[in-house]
Amino acid sequence: MANKLFLVCATFALCFLLTNASIYRTVVEFDEDDASNPMGPRQKCQKEFQQSQHLRACQKLMRMQMRQGRGGGPSLDDEFDLEDDIENPQGPQQGHQILQQCCSELRQEEPVCVCPTLRQAARAVSLQGQHGPFQSRKIYKTAKYLPNICKIQQVGECPFQTTIPFFPPY
């Protein structure tokens, strides 16, 4: 009787393990759908960033927003409205035109690549000149809200950290 009970329990355990292994295998197959793509998501976004000519209009817009803080223009606060804040020495019309070009560039990106390419564009703008922490914050804050302003619904806003860390004086 003990042998029969052991045999039944062993059979159930084997069935459970086989079922669990096949479920796991199925999950892996669904999760690894992009495994057939030799280019991972990071390389794909990097390639899109290069093909979109590094989001030139968006970089120009970030530079405009960064310069606004220097000349006493409107500053960025928690209620960030890029469309209202755009100022350009050549006139507000050109500022809105650059915003529209930037939105067009972002709409050409894959939704999963919008934030990574905006991060690369913001990094490029930050590295192009001698910027203090407040200008860098303004660059990243502009990049953070651009998908929302451009009404890219799949993205909303990018999860960039826009706070400036405190550095104690030495």
From Swiss-Prot:
Gene3D superfamilies: Plant lipid-transfer and hydrophobic proteins. Residues 22-37, 73-88 form a propeptide. Keywords: Disulfide bond, Seed storage protein, Signal, Storage protein. Residues 1-21 form the signal peptide. It holds the Pfam family Tryp_alpha_amyl. Belongs to the 2S seed storage albumins family. This is a 2S seed storage protein. The mature protein consists of a small and a large chain linked by disulfide bonds. This is 2S seed storage protein 2. It comes from Arabidopsis thaliana. The gene is AT2S2.
